Amino acid sequence: MKAIVYTKYGPPEVLQLKEVEKPTPKDNEILIKNHATSVNYGDISTRNFKNIPLRDFHMPLPLLLPTRIAFGLRKPRKRILGSEFAGEIEEVGKNVKLFEKGDQVFGYLSMNMGAYAQYICISEDARVATKPANMNYEEAAVVPYGVIMALSLLRKVNIQPGQKVLVNGASGGIGSAAIQLAKYYGAEVTGVCGTPRLEFVRSLGADQVIDYTREDFTASSETYDLIFDILGKGSFSRCKGSLKENGCYLLASFKMKKLFQMLWTKIRGGKRVICALAFDKSEDLIFIKELVEAGKIKSIIDRSYPMEQAAEAHRYYEEGQHRGKVVITLDHNNKT
């Protein structure tokens, strides 16, 4: 089979299309003929892991060395990137009960990665579910990551109808999911983004949109129950004046300083910092599938690239001008 492989850390050009061995499912595994995957922040940072600046390492610094060892100090241990996928089950192990050959599925591999390949072999208990009936493979492949991350945080703070939510970084994968989920839960949502993306964020359902190049939301007298800072580029000290008395500052990352702030604000009470990573389950994907089929969550695709142009897809993502998700399609016409 064909896969997008990288054997050294570096720029997008390290991604190469190569022939690799097709996996064989074990008794409790399913073999998925993969049709689409995506480009996420995790793919970019993992590909360039050896050279990633400390300021962009979204984990506590004591975890830097163990993480480097896990991923590979000098070269990648896992040569195939990609965490999101959508495809069709081609073969099932003899003990598989949840799926059948021919089922159309989508899912999330998290840090295991491996979705930049024509075939994926995973346990039936992994983060995989039947694909939403109203989405094609490309649309389904870009849903899991952002929605799972946003859902994890919003559940953690028990979001309530009528609450005021601000999403800073509203046009990316997690931000666009956070807006749609907050609206589903009945919140009043404000999205913060740059000038070219204002209409895009409005189209997601945001009640208000702030252009950060013209207005600083922290300088306003407006206050919010929840402020969702997607990659933690702001700060709690800067944003806490914009939080209501018991408001929460939400982060989809957990640097050491943020963890200390989370612990301290939990002890102190009042305004709180909440850091969370998604310990997602297949049940979450089933819930997401239901939201998609009910029209509450839509897939936002900016560009789609064939697997031969994976480097170009990564380069475009790194430019930071995408609105929504970047897709990589996996052609099977000439597979081996």
Residue ranges of model-derived segments:
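Short, well-ordered loop/turn sites that connect or cap secondary structure elements
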Residues: 99-100, 159, 243
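A short acidic, Gly/Pro-enriched loop at the edge of an enzyme's catalytic core
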Residues: 218-226
